[in-house]
Amino acid sequence: MLCPNCHQNASRVIDSRPTDEGRTIRRRRECENCGYRFTTFERVEQSPLLVIKNDGTREAFSREKILNGVAAACQKRPVTSEQLNKLVDNVENRIRAKGVSEIYSKEIGELVMDQLADIDDVAYIRFASIYRQFTDMSSFMKTMEDMMDRHSKAK
């Protein structure tokens, strides 16, 4: 592994532990050349997954794109980065469990909204307002009512 400090290819692992419920290995490394310590993460390489967008174009699945969209919806809300990462993990796991190589962006949006509804109501409404592109107040109110119904059933 190249040292990010001196760019030499001589490092040794000084600590290794599973993270992310065993799906990732966190390794603490030390460069044998300059002594710089750094962290790396190892995870299983997943098969490529393509997203079919609304206009029919295809692009590679991006965890970062989902994370950025959810983070924007959760701005100034009491939602931790750990919760956001877990949400994205859950969405990706549910997609991969389907065993498909392509998925519609609409399906991804629904999976995100399903997960987000359990985390924060306001973030859910924010995400839904962009994702569903509300054109009138009645569609917005319908989403609000659905959210309120979901809460009353949960109690």
UniProtKB/Swiss-Prot annotation:
GO terms for molecular function: ATP binding; DNA binding; zinc ion binding. InterPro entries: ATP-cone_dom, NrdR-like_N, RNR_NrdR-like. A zinc finger (unnamed) spans 3-34. The keyword Chloroplast does not apply. The keyword Membrane does not apply. Binds 1 zinc ion. One of its GO terms (biological process) is negative regulation of DNA-templated transcription. It comes from the Bacteria. Its cofactor is Zn(2+). Keywords: ATP-binding, DNA-binding, Metal-binding, Nucleotide-binding, Repressor, Transcription, Transcription regulation, Zinc, Zinc-finger. PANTHER family: TRANSCRIPTIONAL REPRESSOR NRDR. HAMAP family: NrdR (MF_00440). Belongs to the NrdR family. NCBIfam families: transcriptional regulator NrdR. Negatively regulates transcription of bacterial ribonucleotide reductase nrd genes and operons by binding to NrdR-boxes. This is Transcriptional repressor NrdR. The lineage of its organism: Bacteria, Bacillati, Bacillota, Bacilli, Lactobacillales.
